[in-house]
């Protein structure tokens, strides 16, 4: 599943085609994706201008001139094919490089825009979805209600980590993946951040706050490296796992900077470390870490 940096890469790739343009025609190849499409979906979009395109956690949000917001989630294999006004074809977030003929049968929603662009949503597994909600109710809609703070920007800090994790016995990795606490973090970047912070993934989350609820040095460092890892991954265009490529057809490059993720049995890359990357399973997900750099405490 694409994580925050990959979704941000898709957002940046879609922005030139969508923002400022109106939907002139919406074609639906089927009435549902993971969930049924909203009632009168095409009619509610047609003629509306896209005022802005933002990201919340792993969701894309298009603010419309009608006062509604179009929420889009890529699921496991969702992708967008874009024909720009100048005729160039790009794919801002391409996970499955199949032949064009085989891929076309998975084109489910197509948006024709007033600027001449065309945006097509393709989803092999059909785990993605789209919804329309009043923009004023985004924070309380069923997709975002109860969602945690954003890991990029000013919300995430050592103080926030201590406040969110205080008293929790949950393993640190599981707490970081809990979207009710911090929204948008996924398996890849949590493994990488924990390694940079030299924290064992099974450390009780509550250990990052002292008895008075103040952040420990580890909490401050963890907040810092989470931002660093995500910022670097966005700059690299995300991580290519299987066949992910971004807007201009090139692949994301952050996988070349992985320190532990998917490196089981390989030497730890930390300077002076002679440890080997291990893999364990936590809550059904693979966790990669170095026992030397990240000792259990």
Curated annotation (Swiss-Prot):
CDD domains: EcFpg-like_N. SMART domains: Fapy_DNA_glyco, H2TH. A zinc finger (FPG-type) spans 259-295. Its EC number is 3.2.2.23, 4.2.99.18. GO terms for molecular function: 8-oxo-7,8-dihydroguanine DNA N-glycosylase activity; class I DNA-(apurinic or apyrimidinic site) endonuclease activity; damaged DNA binding; zinc ion binding. The keyword Magnesium does not apply. The active site is at residues 2-3, 58, 285. It holds the Pfam family zf-FPG_IleRS. Binds 1 zinc ion per subunit. Keywords: DNA damage, DNA repair, DNA-binding, Glycosidase, Hydrolase, Lyase, Metal-binding, Multifunctional enzyme, Zinc, Zinc-finger. It comes from the Bacteria. It catalyses: Hydrolysis of DNA containing ring-opened 7-methylguanine residues, releasing 2,6-diamino-4-hydroxy-5-(N-methyl)formamidopyrimidine; 2'-deoxyribonucleotide-(2'-deoxyribose 5'-phosphate)-2'-deoxyribonucleotide-DNA = a 3'-end 2'-deoxyribonucleotide-(2,3-dehydro-2,3-deoxyribose 5'-phosphate)-DNA + a 5'-end 5'-phospho-2'-deoxyribonucleoside-DNA + H(+). Signal peptide: none annotated. DNA binds at residues 106, 125, 168. Monomer. Belongs to the FPG family. Involved in base excision repair of DNA damaged by oxidation or by mutagenic agents. Acts as a DNA glycosylase that recognizes and removes damaged bases. Has a preference for oxidized purines, such as 7,8-dihydro-8-oxoguanine (8-oxoG). Has AP (apurinic/apyrimidinic) lyase activity and introduces nicks in the DNA strand. Cleaves the DNA backbone by beta-delta elimination to generate a single-strand break at the site of the removed base with both 3'- and 5'-phosphates. This is Formamidopyrimidine-DNA glycosylase. The gene is mutM.
